[in-house]
């Protein structure tokens, strides 16, 4: 591509080559899965494939956080390739020209590779969900149909379609130049994908967890509050409001600083600059403080609710003590990494750990809720069927 020509934000020229690359990349984990599961029954094979996809999806979410935190989201300013190429190797001249024109800008050799590796991993997950879907539908028609799978094939089908939605969010994250609402939706969409896979893995594993009704209600309440907190965390990150409050427990030396919630939570606006006062959608210091404080205050409520949940799970019986221990450990890690972001000035390792911990909490809560059954009904685990099937 001529580096002097205008750069199209959407360049589908490398799409076919990227598809071939995605198939090649996915062939590596799929080959490993197939070799290990050759003699297994249908349910065990699908369980292993779901676990593999779940593992890579968690990695994708963490690497996506690294892409965002390292300011690499526009390392390749077009989509789906990099300056119309499959990899930064073919776009050396364009990357060099962009970096020379703006040395402190969003494009550099390392950022281009970070962004493209994120896309490669996303494509690999997409192929795996496609294979999951095909395997689930084939299993439904196999000779083992007399022993039906504890999972409707519509679940992996929905998962595959959701990967397509995530791809669209990824595209608009780039083409709309890190539009905060799109960046936040992309982050939340990745976590929805994680939840979908976790629910399917739990259904295939068939290990129901008996819990008192009160504990289950508390778990659902904690999950709802966690969803709100994750959304607020995504909004803090996409608006670069992490450092809006210096110090803890006070914010900039005040218990209740000046805050502009109206501007801070104006969703339909582009990415502004700190201190820009013109226009209702611009991010002012007060609006960033409002975003930060909303996340901080919700964190206090979440720690209390999840701390109570961990205690109730510990007392509910031996089967749920493992969940209680992991929940308490993740909660403590989130508090430490969150405080480190503020006190230490947002170091990359703390910010990345905080994002990974949030994904870990979402995964844990999804598994807990997917496995939990009322105490009197947890003897058997009924198949997880699609409501419309």
Stretches with model-predicted labels:
Residues 1-41:
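Transmembrane alpha-helices
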Residues 2-7, 63-76, 161-187, 236-250, ...:
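Interfacial helix-loop-helix junctions of multi-pass membrane proteins
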Residues 2-4, 69-116, 242-288:
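Extracytosolic (periplasmic/ER-lumenal) interhelical loops and adjacent juxtamembrane/interface segments
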Residues 13-21, 113-131, 180-193, 289-308, ...:
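Membrane-interface loop-to-helix entry segments
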Residues 42-59, 152-159, 209-232, 320-329:
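Interfacial segments of alpha-helical transmembrane regions
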Residues 196-218, 363-389:
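A juxtamembrane structural motif centered on a specific transmembrane helix
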């Amino acid at each position: 591509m001529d580096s002097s020509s205008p750069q199209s934000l959407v360049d589908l020229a490398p799409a076919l080559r990227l598809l071939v690359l995605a198939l090649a990349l996915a062939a590596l984990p799929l080959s490993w899965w197939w070799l290990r599961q050759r003699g297994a029954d249908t349910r065990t094979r699908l369980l292993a494939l779901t676990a593999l996809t779940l593992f890579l999806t968690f990695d994708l979410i963490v690497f996506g956080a690294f892409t965002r935190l390292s300011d690499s989201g526009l390392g390749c300013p077009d989509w789906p390739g990099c300056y119309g190429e499959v990899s930064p190797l073919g776009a050396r001249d364009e990357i060099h020209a962009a970096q020379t024109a703006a040395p402190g800008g969003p494009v550099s050799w390392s950022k281009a590779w970070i962004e493209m590796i994120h896309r490669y991993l996303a494509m690999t997950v997409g192929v795996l969900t496609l294979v999951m879907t095909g395997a689930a539908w084939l299993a439904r028609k196999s000779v083992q149909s007399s022993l039906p799978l504890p999972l409707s094939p519509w679940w992996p089908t929905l998962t595959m379609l959701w990967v397509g939605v995530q791809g669209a969010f990824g595209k608009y994250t780039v083409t709309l130049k890190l539009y905060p609402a799109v960046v936040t939706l992309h982050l939340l969409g990745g976590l929805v994908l994680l939840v979908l896979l976790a629910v399917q893995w739990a259904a295939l594993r068939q290990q129901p967890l008996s819990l008192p009704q009160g504990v289950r209600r508390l778990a659902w309440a904690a999950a709802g509050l966690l969803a709100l907190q994750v959304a607020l965390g995504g909004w803090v990150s996409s608006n670069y409001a992490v450092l809006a409050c210096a110090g803890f427990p006070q914010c900039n030396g005040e218990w209740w600083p000046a805050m502009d919630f109206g501007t801070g939570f104006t969703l339909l606006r582009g990415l502004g600059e700190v201190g820009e006062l013109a226009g209702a959608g611009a991010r002012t210091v007060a609006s960033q403080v409002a975003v930060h404080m909303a996340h901080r205050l919700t964190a206090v409520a979440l720690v209390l609710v999840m701390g109570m949940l961990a205690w109730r799970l510990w007392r509910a019986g031996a089967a749920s003590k493992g969940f209680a221990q992991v929940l308490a450990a993740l909660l403590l890690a989130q508090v430490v990494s969150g405080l480190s972001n503020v006190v230490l000035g947002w170091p990359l390792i703390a910010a990345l750990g905080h994002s990974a911990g949030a994904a870990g909490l979402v995964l844990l809560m999804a598994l807990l809720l997917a496995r939990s059954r009322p105490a009197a009904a947890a003897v058997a685990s009924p198949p997880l069927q699609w409501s419309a099937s």
